Amino acid sequence: MERTLSIIKPDGVKKNLIGEVVKRFQDQGIHIAALKMMQLTQKQAQGFYAVHRERPFFNSLTEFMTSGPIVVMVLEGDDVIAKNRKLMGATNFKEAEEGTIRRDFATDIEKNVVHGSDAPETAAFEIGYFFNDMEIVG
């Protein structure tokens, strides 16, 4: 059984897409093992995206991720990282397949509604960043 982290970004929360995103996960048989809404501080956003610290979009990304509440979830299931990434679609919504979350709801490459872990190692770090073991119901 694999786990991954999913975030509904501030634009997705603002557009009232929480239910739609959760429904898409559930329609694919993905178990939601943990879920919470929170408001990231600048320090939390910088820590979470530290891997991008030297990238030109880092400041813009952390400002955006602190611009409103987010929903963080632990998703669980067989091959859930790949399933989640397929449901999300390409980072650039213009390149995402029809019917994916980003193609259906994103407005630009940064405001692309959702974030998802890209590998088991990343998922382990990201899940631990937001959740402790007591908060995850597997």
From Swiss-Prot:
One GO cellular component, as annotated: cytoplasm
- Reply yes or no: does the keyword Plastid apply: no
PROSITE patterns the UniProt entry points to: NDPK, NDPK_LIKE
Q: Name the chemical reaction catalysed here.
A: a 2'-deoxyribonucleoside 5'-diphosphate + ATP = a 2'-deoxyribonucleoside 5'-triphosphate + ADP; a ribonucleoside 5'-diphosphate + ATP = a ribonucleoside 5'-triphosphate + ADP
Q: Which Pfam families match?
A: NDK (PF00334)
Q: Which cofactor does it need?
A: Mg(2+)
Could you tell me which InterPro entries the record lists for this protein? NDK-like_dom (IPR034907), NDK-like_dom_sf (IPR036850), Nucleoside_diP_kinase (IPR001564), Nucleoside_diP_kinase_AS (IPR023005)
Subcellular location per UniProt equals: Cytoplasm
Keywords in alphabetical order: ATP-binding, Cytoplasm, Kinase, Magnesium, Metal-binding, Nucleotide metabolism, Nucleotide-binding, Phosphoprotein, Transferase
Please name the SMART domains in this protein's record. NDK
Query: Could you tell me what this protein does?
Result: Major role in the synthesis of nucleoside triphosphates other than ATP. The ATP gamma phosphate is transferred to the NDP beta phosphate via a ping-pong mechanism, using a phosphorylated active-site intermediate.
Q: Could you describe the subunit structure of this protein? A: Homotetramer.
What protein name applies here? Nucleoside diphosphate kinase
Species name: Desulforapulum autotrophicum (strain ATCC 43914 / DSM 3382 / VKM B-1955 / HRM2)
Q: Which gene encodes it?
A: ndk
